[in-house]
Amino acid sequence: MNNKEPHTPAIQLWVDDPSEEPPKGWLLCQNAFRAIEILQGGQVTRISLSYHLGQEEHVGTGRDVLLWILGALSMGFEPPEIGVHCRVPSQRQSLLAAVTQIDKLHYAP
């Protein structure tokens, strides 16, 4: 899976609920499933996630996005730079643990 197409505009994807304004230049995505669709387009160079996006059964979580990235690595997906901006300590730790797994698999020799 080649997700880095030449000559495509870069996207910085901010995955969070509507109460959080993204930094200037970042695209706000309030739905984990939509975030995954955007990632599949191959234009995302940076992604920053919060855990809670709204009602989980309807919009998923930031962790769902990271688990998708983790699974897509085996198909050749090149992950973007990943950040976590979640403020809830337990949820932040869950996201960071998934990022660590992604880093280990992606950068393993």
Report residues per predicted region.
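Catalytic phosphate/metal-binding cores of nucleic-acid and nucleotide-processing enzymes, i.e., regions
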Residues: 1-109
